[in-house]
Amino acid sequence: MAVVDDLAHSGMDAVPPSEDFGRQPPQDLAAEQSVLGGMLLSKDAIADVLERLRSGDFYRPAHQNVYDAILDLYGRGEPADAVTVAAELDRRGLLRRIGGAPYLHTLISTVPTAANAGYYAGIVAEKALLRRLVEAGTRVVQYGYAGAEGADVAEVVDRAQAEIYDVAECRLSENYVPLEDLLQPTMDDLDAIASNGGISRGAPTGFTELDEVTNGLHPGQMIIVAARPGVGKALALDTPLPTPTGWTAMGDVAVGDELLAVDEAPTRVVAATEVMLGRPCYEIEFSDGTVIVADAQHQWPTSYGIRTSAQLRCGLDIIAAAGSTPRHAGRLTTAAFMAPVLCIDSVRRVRSVPVRCVEVDNAAHLYLAGRGMVPTHNSTLGLDFMRSCSIKHRLASVIFSLEMSKSEIVMRLLSAEAKIKLADMRSGRMTDDDWTRLARRMSEISEAPLYIDDSPNLTMMEIRAKARRLRQKTNLKLVVVDYLQLMTSGKRFESRQVEVSEFSRHLKLLAKELELPVVAISQLNRSPEQRTDKKPMLSDLRESGSLEQDADVVILLHRPDAFDRDDPRGGEADLILAKHRNGPTKTVTVAHQLHLSRFTNMAR
């Protein structure tokens, strides 16, 4: 039996279709011959068939080879008849394998008329769909046996569901629609926009000025929200970093090494920069005597929110430290207890030194640095869109978070909605007023149709399958993927850029298929930091130019005070609408309240 699709998945071996059921797989060889015969007779038949069939839809491998040769000739603008197709197959060394040139003439003689090629193609497509269903069922059975033998049951169920969804996805349909059939739905959309205050049926972002420009996030759109990663920034090369077995230095750590997360659990380094020279640096001394040299943009989680090195204030900013840390440089233990917070004793500008940064894979993106075990941090914008969509407007949304855990996301949502400092929530310093505000908001928050999936190492296929399933259950209106550069395909690509391009293409296809906006959180490269004007540009999108090409909307996040603590626009952030396929570009200014885990509209 021919294997039509290679549906191997990461983490679980592909299961070949079984031929042990004693039945002939669904097929119609006469219909296959009639399709190919019609294509050899008529160019119009080729155009009709290629919209309905893929090569793998043919049961006989010989028919697959003939079909591929016909399409290649047709695509090159060359005639596709018995003579030219025979020559093409001979060039590929496949002519004898399909039965030689006489078989091509047999195909022509079996078809009564080329005009019916499209009808025959429908028969072939139906049989192919049934074969895929049989093959998927065989794999599902084998997955069930794998679960009985100790494989993760949740993963087995997810793979089984994905198999069935993949079968349904293979069905082809005519996507062109006559204009007259589109006029009334378009008029209905216009009426809905007018009655909704100018906002289309898309999901509102929650930012008034941005919604005025975009009319919300529209079905079928892929929206890229990109910012510089705040994780790690840059520390001096001699900065000590605790590891599960001792200590290393920032200059020595490599991708794949393990550091310690803020809870002192091992966390793996997934990215590391080259050594950077000439960056403005600060020496920060903490209340326990720890001294760390970091570049001006290094971010620290303080009691007042995220602050860069240049923004830290002596005697005012407090940084939470690890709960229990060693006081010596030997093997790490939990014997010595450290005060739960560290005060900033001094911050002073020092001469520039070589610096470097790393990125870690734990959910909070925190790792410990220095003998005092001081954590560093990162944050994103996507949750603001979800809060507007689900909490304010009661539209279903889902976030696939490869960066933060469920608990971290919920804590940020509560912080933003109840206006409670995230640092106070994490450290147990909430006041009675904080608890009262939280209680008032809990009812509305708990009723929001907002879904969170923090499954590690999510593949694009899994995201698509889960989004489809949720769409059927909840009338899903918004998908957020956080973030793009943490996605994995489970396949081999010639470069990471090619892999990210593939993710980009599939996210756009997902938006069109489910008819909803898909927001992909992405990263910018470090180019803005090297320019006098720090504002990011489209060319700064990290790892793939395809992101810019595939996206309908690209929003670049820029905070002026992240680069200069004395910037007159302190507390402001720019949402740079750098690409807007269906409208104008614009820069929208919002207020950042990072201590409350949110951005908000500027006061008017």
From Swiss-Prot:
Post-translational modification: This protein undergoes a protein self splicing that involves a post-translational excision of the intervening region (intein) followed by peptide ligation.
Amino-acid positions noted as binding ATP in the UniProt annotation, renumbered to this chain: A227, R228, P229, G230, V231, G232, K233, A234
GO cellular component: cytosol; primosome complex
Gene3D superfamilies reported for this sequence: DNAb Helicase, Chain A (1.10.860.10), Hedgehog/Intein (Hint) domain (2.170.16.10), P-loop containing nucleotide triphosphate hydrolases (3.40.50.300)
E.C. number(s) listed in UniProt: 5.6.2.3, 3.1.-.-
Location of the region described as Disordered in the Swiss-Prot/TrEMBL record: 1-25
Molecular function (Gene Ontology), one example: ATP hydrolysis activity
Domain SF4 helicase: 196-462, 341-604
Keywords noted in UniProt: ATP-binding, DNA replication, DNA-binding, Helicase, Hydrolase, Isomerase, Nucleotide-binding, Primosome, Repeat
Subunit description: Homohexamer.
Protein name, as recorded: Replicative DNA helicase DnaB
Organism: Mycobacterium leprae (strain TN)
